[in-house]
């Protein structure tokens, strides 16, 4: 075995790429390391495409092995199971920038598997996974227009930071991942603390500039370790068939794309395509209908893009910077804690907000350590939203990705646990979809949170931008339709407040997207965002003054941390009795913070009263109403507070001589006692006769 190794410095870390030792039967295998975080990336491609396939079957599988962090998996089977949400998101992060780099017409199946085999808790594995994938594809021989570079950018104290550590990210105002080739940015994914447009654009440019060292290193690695490129040629088009289809369908498709209602437009497009196929079959019964479908799709794209470049109205009649009609409703469901219905044209989201206690928060145990999510956002995309039938069940990759994007857009304005001690779950049900449903989820979430009384810092709105570019001519589109997303060159989603951007996601399908074009898109998105925020604020401009009557109310009190064990009791007996008898949920923290949750105010008051009793200190000289719990020869033990007992000596029962304690006291008898002394060991000395004397004097 002769390993080929390439090492280079990248930000704070040394990156190492190695091949030739592990997984030698794959088309390519690279062991990629950044510090102590190491991933094994393998690539396998089929030399022949399956007959009849009309799409590119690329699969990216990202898997984190618990042994990488020196852990044994939990659960009964003690082995890794289905992909976690984090694994799904990173798989999408890798897939998005590499997919456009495969040539048009390439239909051979390709599978990329990334396995995390070692992890440094301060170095996230996603960036090195992207670098390793780029290197493996570069040396595999599979047609691929790489290399691809990747970088994470932070923003700390007004300075950009390349590949910040996990600790640095905790103080960073920005967490941005950018991937691209030597000449183009292809993908951006970010979360930010309402940063200005110029800072966000600067971070993209900075990240792309810094990753050139990666691209150069992979090119050198390929020169030394790369396999010969496959002998593959793109399928040629039949020029006569292209001309026939243009003559038969161009005018009809042009008319169909003037129909503004999506379902009616699709129906007419289907009519035009069916008539075209019928005419072609009449002249040539053996014609390949799959090729006809592909050429019709290309013609469709050309028709729509041509109209936009010529300055004609868009598919639904709008100008490039126009936003579709908005409808904003808050408080639409009677029993939810918060709800909103946000409609933008033919895209609609029904969003609900549910409040819970800290124990309702999501507990996540990953190879990067344990963490808790108090704010959850789940996105559902049922098939009826686009007028189709389909499987309904667990969320797919796309739904997980869109939900996380919306979460990033909102997270920056969420209150801290000290400000709002609730767990929050938001669910966005996409009930209609024609473009930008994730950004509709951002808007709907902002509204639902306010309706629920969650004190978010300010409203948040999201907008999806598009681009059509032909040569030096380009048009930036605001609030794109589904067709404009599919037929355009860029999908550019921006969420934010009036003050700045909270989330930015960008996927670019072509090269030649300049800094100037991105700047125009960001400025146009800002205008669209402010317009949407104005409409949203008319419906609900700030959070409700109070939470829903149906939501649990959390009351926070403080106790002496040394008294926590008294509230818990032996084996949890005291706190269990408290919760069962009052019907409340009680959570204790190490600093003495007690959170009591209940939708019944009287139950909360009773729980507080009992906790205060348990944690209160015994006062010398005070009279308590106690209960006799044990009788002995020399006196009786009386419980005066929960968990606190004292001794009434036989001499302190009565002014008269007491020969037998049982003649004066019995078990469970309630008596008034005065605290005479609490010694250094915490033992309490009580007196019944002194209490009676004091009460008599008071009378």
Swiss-Prot record:
Could you say which EC number(s) this protein's record lists?
A: 2.7.7.8
Record's subunit section = Component of the RNA degradosome, which is a multiprotein complex involved in RNA processing and mRNA degradation.
**What keywords appear on the UniProt entry?**
Cytoplasm, Magnesium, Metal-binding, Nucleotidyltransferase, RNA-binding, Transferase
Name the encoding gene, please.
pnp
**Source domain of life:** Bacteria
Q: What is its main location?
A: cytoplasm
- Positions binding Mg(2+) in this chain are 485, 491
The protein's required cofactor(s) are namely:
Mg(2+)
Cross-referenced InterPro entries: ExoRNase_PH_dom1, ExoRNase_PH_dom2, ExoRNase_PH_dom2_sf, KH_dom, KH_dom_type_1, KH_dom_type_1_sf, NA-bd_OB-fold, PNPase
List the Pfam families. KH_1 (PF00013), PNPase (PF03726), RNase_PH (PF01138), RNase_PH_C (PF03725), S1 (PF00575)
Q: Which residues form the S1 motif domain?
A: 621-689
GO BP, one example?
Answer: RNA processing
Similarity section: Belongs to the polyribonucleotide nucleotidyltransferase family.
> Which Gene Ontology CC terms are recorded?
cytosol
Q: Where is the signal peptide?
A: none
Q: List the source organism.
A: Shewanella baltica (strain OS223)
> Which SUPFAM superfamilies does the record match to this protein?
Eukaryotic type KH-domain (KH-domain type I), Nucleic acid-binding proteins, Polynucleotide phosphorylase/guanosine pentaphosphate synthase (PNPase/GPSI), domain 3, Ribonuclease PH domain 2-like, Ribosomal protein S5 domain 2-like
Q: Which reaction does it catalyse?
A: RNA(n+1) + phosphate = RNA(n) + a ribonucleoside 5'-diphosphate
Report the GO molecular function annotations: 3'-5'-RNA exonuclease activity; magnesium ion binding; polyribonucleotide nucleotidyltransferase activity; RNA binding
What Gene3D superfamilies does this protein map onto? GHMP Kinase, N-terminal domain, K Homology domain, type 1, Nucleic acid-binding proteins
Sequence ranges assigned to domain KH in this UniProt record: 552-611
Task: State the compartments where it is located.
Answer: Cytoplasm
The UniProt function text for this chain reads: Involved in mRNA degradation. Catalyzes the phosphorolysis of single-stranded polyribonucleotides processively in the 3'- to 5'-direction.
Report what the protein is called: Polyribonucleotide nucleotidyltransferase
